[in-house]
Amino acid sequence: MIGSAPHAALNLEVARRSLVLLRNDGVLPLAGGFAADDAGRARGDGGPPRTVAVVGPLADDAQTQLGDWAGSSGQANWMRDGQPRDMITTVLDGLRAHVPAGWAVTHARGADILTMAPDPEGALFPDGQPRPQVVLPCPPDTALIAEAVAAAEGADYVVAVVGDRIELVGEGCSTATLNLVGGQIALLDALAATGTPMVVVLLASKPLVLPDSALDAAALLWVANPGMRGGRAIAELLLGLVEPAGRLPISFARHVGQQPTYYNQIRGQHGSRYADLTQRPAFAFGDGLSYTTVEYADLRVAPGDLAPTDTVRAEVTVRNTGTRPVLETVQAYVSDDVTSVSWADKELKAFRQVELEPGRSATVRIDVPVADCAIVDGRGVRVVEPGDFTLLVGPSSRDETLLRAPFTVRPAG
């Protein structure tokens, strides 16, 4: 039943597992991290109390946190006043409820994102269907920014929650820009100038092109639309009550001119860069950090040529070389070395998750059916072409992170 205790618990666990840490200079977990008390709140460690300034137009935006096709989202208006507010934990709610006793949490909005206005071409399309309203970005507000800057200057940490409102995503809501809309970039720039360590929480269901003030922040977290208990999950991650485990299912361009940006590029294109920029994205498919360090070694593929009906069987050693536990997502990609038609340079074929305590290692087995290595040939037929392949295994789709091992598929029959 929606809204029941089991439903809320499931949402919390899904949110915890989906948060993606993209940058961390060591500021996270805050104050080195905490253990939880019986109520789930961070237990103080005897250190000095801290102040966390929670700022941004989405820090306490309950409805946008739910994402598209939720009640009152614009695509689903069956709940005119939105989901019940007391069922939703925003980032501000989560931090207020989970910081150690004695810590202070302050709040400033800092910026507005948008207002809505009637379409200047009229209220109806020629066929009589209603035209949706159009978005008008809000200009930076000096008073709101000044309030946020004052909060940041009076804090030990600033958590800036920015991104997209529900009017900027979903059916009929595509945007021409991938930048943060409204006064958000000016807000981040002003917060960065204070020198207070800034954690940027990006609440957006599509990849955005981020300003330097976000890319260079002390930490950057992509949370997508984490649902009703998302604010608690985010607070737990910031405080070290849970470990970061999410990985990007999309790529983030560094500049809008790089679009389309995706990991499984077709090989054979002429060159790998623009005159003024490489094709390397800001963040790639599969990226995601943890609070520890992990090493991959000794990728091994079972010897022997394979038939199209066989399975590639491989093993890799994964070791937690840091001081905190980790849930590591081991990603396996396949590259068909020579194809009869243009095809993706590599494609994700499998992944495995392994829990590792500090200092521990594990041998992770990866099985990839050869049938999953098919391409669509010049006749439009899906087929596994015999020849040489490469298995690539690592923590991300980025080439420099992947171990490689060859395997060969023999002709059928």
Task: Map each language-model feature to its residues.
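Intrinsically disordered, low-complexity Pro/Gly/Ser/Thr-rich segments with frequent PxxP/GP/PP motifs
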Residues: 340-376
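Short, hydrophobic/aromatic beta-strand segments
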Residues: 324-332, 343-344, 376-378
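Active/binding-pocket-proximal capping segment
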Residues: 70-72, 112, 168, 175-177, ...
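Short acidic, glycine/proline-rich loop/turn micro-motifs
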Residues: 65-67, 169-174, 214, 344-345, ...
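Hydrophobic beta-strand signal
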Residues: 159, 313, 363-365, 390
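Hydrophobic helix-and-loop "lid/oligomerization" segment in the mid-to-C-terminal part
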Residues: 3-4, 109, 113-215
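Short glycine/proline/serine/threonine-rich loop/turn segments at secondary-structure transition edges
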Residues: 372-388
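Secreted, periplasmic, or luminal enzymes acting at the cell surface/secretory milieu
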Residues: 1-92, 96-127, 134-136, 203-327, ...
